[in-house]
Amino acid sequence: RDRPTGIWVLRNRGNWADQTSPAKAGNEFNFLNCEGGHIYWWMAHPDRYFKTNPEFFGFSKLTGKREPETLCLTNPELLETAVENLKKRIRAFKEKPDLFTIGFRDSWNMCQCEKCLAPIPLPGGGTLIRKSDDPQEDPLYFSTRYWLFVNQIVERLKQDFPETMFAGSGYFYAAEPPACELDPA
């Protein structure tokens, strides 16, 4: 039952499976154990946090209010909450993942609060100035904002999970290579 799925994954150049995949059962093919993905809600689910901590969520200039579709990547309290929630999720897996992806929802939506649209001081010097409020028109700025957030999370998670590799999502606004180094973990 599992072998055909594993063969199909290999034929399509795949080398991983999550813990729920039929290809993972028995792991005859030595796939990487991968988890994560679209995990913004693992970091701060709107059902739990939106009423009590709306500042965790993205501000929309269009509506003039916080919206639960995305997160405010410059909020330091969100960062700490996200890290603690992700630690709990990773510890809850039967097997610790070989690779954990810190990805966003399939959307161009980004927080448009003053802090998220402010110039970005770059590690190593320099400043990245936003050219547009629209991530499609200024992907370098918004990619850098996202990857700096991912770097902060990875820096904290790798202290507790040194054997786990971490990744992010490189599409939508994050497809543009950022103006910062990525954490090599």
Predicted regions located by residue number:
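Feature activates predominantly on carbohydrate-active enzymes
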Residues: R1-L148, E155-P162, A167-G170, A185
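Distinct, well-ordered alpha-helical segments
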Residues: A175-P184
